[in-house]
Amino acid sequence: MPPASGTRRHRGRSSTCVYCFARKTHSYLDLDTGVGFDTQIVVKVNAPELLRRQLASPRWQGEHVAMGTNVDCYQRAEGRYRLMPGILFALRERANPFSILTKGTLILRDLDLLRQSAEVTDVGVSVSVGFTDTELWRTVEPGTPAPQRRLDVVRTLTGHGIGCGVLMAPVIPFLGDEPAQLRATVRAIAAAGATSVTPLALHLRPGAREWFMAWLGQHHPHLVRRYERLYADGAYAPKWYQRRITRQVHELAEEYGIGPTRAGMPRRIAQPGPTDPTEPDGSAGAVGPAVGAAGAGPVQLTLI
């Protein structure tokens, strides 16, 4: 596991978003960042074993491990390769704090293991839901679970005593940032029982920028010039725009009773100790973005 970057279980995404900032990573392997990123998935099948070695190293200080921060660790490929149960078991075995960010409903497959982990260490979960507009979802996030299904994940996790926040990302300029759209999204997040909501405006890094702008030109050509102006200075929307979105979402979160800047609070839940999920009678555990850490800052564990 490379220092300060974690292990890469998969690179590329079978559950594609036209704006995905991780597209650039495919170029490091001389692969296409457009269609290639969507269809050519590179899998590190020995990720659980590599993690176990890293956690057992005398140099490891129990740093918080953040998963899903580059590409989704619960994308479709995980259904086939089943790497997360072994990874979660390794973290639970060492009582190592961790977090997971995901758009995937497959996290519920590992619910038991997540609960078991939460008994011995700090575990947090965050689900990414940038908007609830189904038409926008169909065009900009093809292959991902519908926003309502992701909110059902939040509802299920919180129903089992596992605090789950929502990363409201991306807020897409001129397509998903109208006041009524923001209100509808925050209202739905609150109804799902999220412990927090954190807005993040769309950012367009190299690789993602070219792919997104091509998509925009095809589906919303009248917005191309506006985007060129808004993102003229780089990958990120201007500070004034980010502040406006953050203020609006925080006000709505307060109105609906959500703590907008609190991380999802980890829970410790009494549960019998797990068996190794790689054994025939092993149990799978729950997964989710976690908060809480030990030692220095979080170490990124990129699985997919």
Please tell me what each predicted stretch does.
Residues 1-10, 18-126, 130-138, 147-151:
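Conserved Radical SAM active-site core
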